[in-house]
Amino acid sequence: MSERKLFTSESVSEGHPDKIADQISDAILDAILAKDPEAHVAAETCVYTGSVHVFGEISTTAYVDINRVVRDTIAEIGYTEAEYGFSAESVGVHPSLVEQSPDIAQGVNEALEAREGQSDDFNVIGAGDQGLMFGFAIDETPELMPLPISLSHQLVRRLATLRKSGEISYLRPDAKSQVTVEYDEHDKPVRVDTVVISTQHDPEVSNDQIRQDMIEQVIKAVIPAHYLDEKTRFLINPTGRFVIGGPQGDSGLTGRKIIVDTYGGYARHGGGAFSGKDATKVDRSASYAARYIAKNLVAAGLASKAEVQLAYAIGVAQPVSVRVDTFGTSTVSESILEAAVRQVFDLRPAGIIKMLDLKRPIYKQTAAYGHMGRTDIDLPWEHLDKVSPLTEAVAALSEGA
């Protein structure tokens, strides 16, 4: 009998409390970068019933109306009714932002390499902190993402579309999805075993109506029919009621959905969150670079699955380590792939920032529905422009091996 395994990932909607916080943090970052691309930003947000607290460290020459940015973001998400317990125009906004520590700034503004006399423009910026970051790609989906997280994101995005268009009028902003995929003995996805959708709703709608709409207008509209069968389970609002939601039901905090933001648990995670951080913070920029590398490796046919680890020391430009793991799927040795990666990609913070053009206000759009594998927006770390350079570098290194 062939061995089959299950793997589960989840996603949450833009109206989930933690995602509200992420979007506010990134909206503040974007507003600052639009006026001052050289700004250093670390903006954290906490939301709960009737209140938003914004705190952190910012070094900038720009003035931004934090209060207005917060309220506009909340309204765009859909919290505009007082009965939700959290409304854009009535919520209390409490900013508490200070300047970045000069001890940190001296290492970011002038890397160790520059202080030691290594004259190179890309040695100017040091990593904003120590840490390890992962990027991943796999050939399970056209966007080279694991299927469980891809489907989970699509479900909550579909919910948001139906809510904002008014097609399903009883929907409220908070929602979660979870998809369990069954894999065969070759680790290939064969079917969807279980789908969970929990969606906030108006009080008068029946559970039967919600279930019918979720199955017909959300699940079957998103998940390809060949993955669904008579044994697939649909668990819709399993508690039986989800009227109280958003920050009225749970507090939210920036950086608490790091697995949703990346690969749904299918790949490793270095632990650093993304939202509210400018690109000198390698938690964010190096994670994007690692995804860029992994995706181009898989797209080039050099592996069917690739995980890239990068690691940095605070105030140092060059990564302290670069590792490529292809889980036995590569067409050449991993040492050759690592050497090719070092040739093709400049992985110093300034190199990553230039390569991916990260001083632009592009971050708020990433703060819900995943930072990786997005097909609805154009993100530079999802581009496949390094396929040819990687292929050529691997060929040259293989000849010399």
Swiss-Prot record:
Q: Name it.
A: S-adenosylmethionine synthase
Where, in this chain's numbering, is L-methionine bound?
Answer: 57, 100, 250, 281
Which GO CC annotations does the UniProt entry carry? cytoplasm
Per the record's keyword annotation, is Translocase included, yes or no? no
Q: GO molecular-function annotation terms?
A: ATP binding; magnesium ion binding; methionine adenosyltransferase activity
Q: Which cofactor does it need?
A: Mg(2+); K(+)
NCBIfam families reported for this sequence: metK
- Which domain of life does this protein belong to? Bacteria
> In which compartments does the protein localize?
Cytoplasm
The EC class name is: transferase
The cofactor note from the UniProt entry for this protein is: Binds 2 divalent ions per subunit.
| Binding-site residues, Mg(2+) | 18
Record-listed E.C. numbers: 2.5.1.6
User: What does the similarity note say?
Assistant: Belongs to the AdoMet synthase family.
Assembly state and interactors?
Homotetramer; dimer of dimers.
Q: What does this protein do?
A: Catalyzes the formation of S-adenosylmethionine (AdoMet) from methionine and ATP. The overall synthetic reaction is composed of two sequential steps, AdoMet formation and the subsequent tripolyphosphate hydrolysis which occurs prior to release of AdoMet from the enzyme.
Task: Report residue spans for region: Flexible loop.
Answer: 100-110
Pathway linked to the protein? Amino-acid biosynthesis; S-adenosyl-L-methionine biosynthesis; S-adenosyl-L-methionine from L-methionine: step 1/1
**Which SUPFAM superfamilies did the record assign?**
S-adenosylmethionine synthetase
Which positions does UniProt annotate for ATP binding? 16, 174-176, 241-242, 250, 256-257, 273, 277
Give each disulfide bond as a residue pair: none
